[in-house]
Amino acid sequence: MIALLVGGKNGKRFGMKSNIVVNVVKMTNQNKEQIKNPSVLVWLRNDLRVTDQHSFISATTSGANVFAYYSFDPKHYGNTKWGFPKTEAFRAQFLIETITELQQSLEALNITLIVEQGNPAEGLPKWIEQLNIKTIYFQKEWTKEEREVEAQLREAIPAEVKFQSHYDQFLFHPDDLPFKISALPEVFTQFRKVCEKHSHVRIQQQNCTPLPKENVLQQKFKIPTLKDLGIDKKIAHPNSAFPFKGGNLEAKQRLNYYFWDSKKLSFYKQTRNGLIGKDYSSKFSAWLANGSLSPRQIYWEIIAYEKQIIKNQSTYWLIFELLWRDYFKYISLKHQVRIFYLEGILQKKYHWENDIEKVNAWIDGKTQEPFVNANMIELKKTGWMSNRGRQNVASYFAKELLLDWRIGAAYFESMLVDYDVHSNYGNWMYVAGVGNDPRDRKFNVRLQAERYDEAGKFQRMWNQKTLFE
């Protein structure tokens, strides 16, 4: 195991209290009457939207009082075993913006979003008792940490409280696959062809109808700041390819711009390997990662675009990328914790190294390869890296430096604004040769730089020092 690889500033996160403020429901007489009636609660994790959201539809049509709950779990803001902060400033700020907008959207539906800091398994039980919760609706998660919290919660609350969980993060719902998860193809192309032929994408779910105003709790819930989470704020970089904010509203604005205003979608296949600017790719991944945008919303907007504007290779290719996202989720659903193992899902052994100096040189953009360095500096300064960049720096880390690929994956988890556990570890396994790449390729970084940064503009942008550095 590698000792602390990054600076000591973040060490204060270990001392972060599990609950900074203990919330107590402040009830008016009206609310007291309300709580006598059975209530339901939507427990939010990576499904941070109101539209096309199964849990909210189920809850608001139940006939009961409805509340929502989100907790900033301190485990997500401490340090990993590799020494990296689990969540750095870029993604944390994006999440704060997402929760802020979600709270406002729910207020418009007369639903209170309870926001806390702490382990949900410790915070939720008191609300279940005080609000007379009889059913908890939530999105199914299957990776280790999420399952542990769910198991703790089930132990902590009365057995008569019902759990209603749903898969709501896929393009192709698991129930609509033409095979069992255990029979999932180990090669993406096989998965894609079978699903395209035999599966279908479900229609978007209806919007929620506002509830009576009596449903609202009088208490206001404060959303934590970066400082509350023990994270130092970072200034937005003027050259960032991801200058966007969190939340479903911003996601919809981006979708409308990329599709209808600029019609960039028509050229997506030609531009998707770009490196500079906000429009070479869709940039939907960050909203997809925390569930403030659903893949179905994107898919059906593509279908509308194909009917009204043009249907071509580019419109298909964005669906193709959504299928890759689905595939890595299904790979983790099939293989569970093996996606975190050094040997990966192939149980393939390599001679990996844990050279701290090499790891830090990679992180700081001080390797022998300028193209790798430029991408790593971009990541450190903006929380973003292009898909082409990610493939190259990961291949260099695992195949050239021969470093334990899980360290690189953990650093991406820390830094990326669009971190998604399934895509991150699925892609890292793929590149490292322990995942779903049947050819076990190694990127020639210099040839890649010549092809995708022929004039060297991207490398100059990030490798040249400024007056303030």
Identify the role of each PLM range.
Residues 277-468:
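Active-site-proximal binding-pocket segments
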Residues 182-341, 452-453, 457-469:
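Glycine/tryptophan-enriched, flexible segments
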Residues 85, 89-93, 242-249, 362:
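Charge-dense, low-complexity intrinsically disordered segments
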Residues 22-203, 377-378, 423-427:
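Trp/Phe/Arg-rich N-terminal binding region typifying the photolyase-homology
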Residues 55, 98, 102, 251-254, ...:
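Alpha-helical packing segments of well-folded alpha/beta enzyme cores
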Residues 1-26:
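N-terminal amphipathic/basic-hydrophobic helices that include classical n-h-c signal peptides
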Residues 106, 157, 192, 259, ...:
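Hydrophobic residues within well-ordered, non-membrane alpha-helices that form the packing/core
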